[in-house]
Curated annotation (Swiss-Prot):
It comes from Lactococcus lactis subsp. cremoris (strain SK11). Consists of 3 domains; the N-terminus binds the ribosome, the middle domain has PPIase activity, while the C-terminus has intrinsic chaperone activity on its own. The keyword Cell cycle applies. The keyword Flavoprotein does not apply. This is Trigger factor. Keywords: Cell cycle, Cell division, Chaperone, Cytoplasm, Isomerase, Rotamase. The gene is tig. Residues 163-248 form the PPIase FKBP-type domain. HAMAP family: Trigger_factor_Tig (MF_00303). It catalyses: [protein]-peptidylproline (omega=180) = [protein]-peptidylproline (omega=0). PANTHER family: TRIGGER FACTOR CHAPERONE AND PEPTIDYL-PROLYL CIS/TRANS ISOMERASE, TRIGGER FACTOR-LIKE PROTEIN TIG, CHLOROPLASTIC. InterPro entries: PPIase_dom_sf, PPIase_FKBP_dom, Trig_fac, Trigger_fac_C, Trigger_fac_C_sf, Trigger_fac_ribosome-bd_bac, Trigger_fac_ribosome-bd_sf, Trigger_fact/SurA_dom_sf.
């Protein structure tokens, strides 16, 4: 195989390669076996025409296109490997020469990764808007939230206030016509929770049990039911009950109700503090890592990022997200219906920061290459086991789905991130 690669820009070039006679013969054999099944010729049963007769009747050239399709993927991959390039998109392939008895010559217009010039990526000084410190107020807030979760709702005769729960019947209409989904019975609604259309809950503050009021609201312009978006509606609402939260006393007994592993309120506070310290420490480390990576990317120079890489990243991110939804039993159609969005909306959402994600990945890959990381079989095995645990899949299935080269690449990327983050200093 003769191979050459000529760059036409930093990210584009022409790959020229040939397919030798032995490979062509293999392709022609595959092509003949595929097409002969549909050929009927007098003197032969359907599909039983001989190769000699086929060549005499149609010419061997009739098999060229099918033969090329059979051998091209392997030939192209071999040419890419020999040229030592990394295409990032499907190539545009043209046949330069395809004659009987000669090697076939082809060209491929390919898009490759851009040249990356690394700047500083170790010992970076970064600023983060995060802290590991846990305050007494944060512990008290956690305790108050737990106390609220165990509060009882007690019927009250006085007027409803923010934070109270009202049990209501309601019938909604637009221009005097009731609409689907606008009716409810014995619905519990916490005032101030923002569960209902903006303006609805505020108009129930001050109402009492047994009262019927007319609540006038306007549906948001981006409301998921398009036929209601931006329209004024009237809800005839009857308040059946008003309930107020009755908080339990903060004592050792409540502490045991909140967490059966503790015996006293002080033990519960200590446990909450430890959990907050762990979560804030993790958030702090994440913030440092993010800031350090952003600094390393800013210090690097990338001449241009091919549009093809941006498009590929958008589709990858979309497929990953929608695939995750499907694992939860939510189809793409269902997701778009629930959220009132479309595939185009999701595409725009991921397109907004696709350039940043691609740029970041390219720099991290370049750092991994600069550090010449090696990956042991034990590390690959540990990565497979970790992924199997994350996705609740058998180890054997993960091994089949993910090539070793891909796993080694991911491990090297993690090592590069670790180098960037662990050497960073916080200002």
């Amino acid at each position: 195989m003769t191979v050459s690669f000529e760059k036409t820009s930093d990210t584009k070039g022409t790959l020229s390669f040939s397919i030798d006679q032995e490979t062509i013969k293999t392709g022609l054999d595959k092509a003949f076996n595929k097409v002969k099944a549909n050929i009927s010729v007098p003197g032969f049963r359907k599909g039983k025409i001989s190769r000699q007769m086929f060549n005499k009747m149609y010419g061997e050239e009739a098999l060229f296109e099918e033969a090329l399709n059979a051998v091209l993927p392997t030939a192209y991959d071999a040419a890419v490997k020999e040229a030592a390039i990394e295409p990032v998109a499907q190539p545009k392939i043209d046949v330069a020469k395809m004659e009987k008895g000669s090697d076939w010559e082809l060209t491929a217009e390919v898009v490759v990764k851009p040249t990356i010039t690394l700047g500083d990526y170790k010992d970076l000084t970064v600023e983060v808007d995060a802290t590991k410190e846990v305050t007494d107020e944060e512990v008290e807030t956690r305790l108050t939230n737990a106390q609220n979760n165990l509060a009882e709702l007690v019927v009250k005769e006085t007027a409803a206030e923010n934070g109270d729960t009202v049990v209501i019947d309601f019938v909604g209409s637009v221009d005097g016509v009731e609409f689907e989904g606008g009716k409810g019975s014995n619905h519990s609604l916490e005032l101030g929770s923002g569960q209902f259309i903006p303006g609805f809950e505020e108009q129930l503050v001050g109402t009492k049990s047994g009262e019927t009021v007319e609540v006038k609201v306007t549906f948001p312009e981006n409301y998921q039911a398009e036929d209601l978006a931006g329209k004024e509606a009237l809800f005839v609402t009857t308040v059946n009950e008003v309930k107020a939260k009755e908080l339990p006393e903060l004592d050792d007994e409540l502490a045991k109700d909140i967490d059966e592993e503790v015996e006293t309120l002080e033990e519960l506070k200590a446990k909450f503090r430890k959990e907050l310290e762990e979560s804030k420490s993790e958030a702090y480390d994440d913030a440092v890592e993010t800031a350090a990576i952003e600094a390393a990317v800013a210090n690097a120079e990338i001449k241009e990022i091919p549009e093809e890489m941006i498009h590929e990243e958008v589709h990858r991110a979309m497929n990953e997200f929608l695939g995750g939804m499907q694992q939860q039993g939510i189809s793409p159609e269902m997701y778009f219906q629930i959220t009132g969005t479309s595939e185009d909306d999701l595409h725009k959402q991921y397109e907004a920061d696709a350039d940043k994600r691609v740029r970041t990945n390219l720099v991290i890959e370049a750092i991994a290459a600069a550090e010449s990381f090696t990956t042991s079989d034990e590390e690959v095995k540990a990565e497979i086991e970790d992924l199997a645990g994350q996705y609740n899949m058998p180890v054997e299935q993960v091994e089949k789905l993910l090539p070793v080269d891909m796993l080694k690449h991911d491990i090297a990327m993690k090592k590069a991130v670790e180098v960037i983050a662990t050497t960073a200093k916080v200002k």
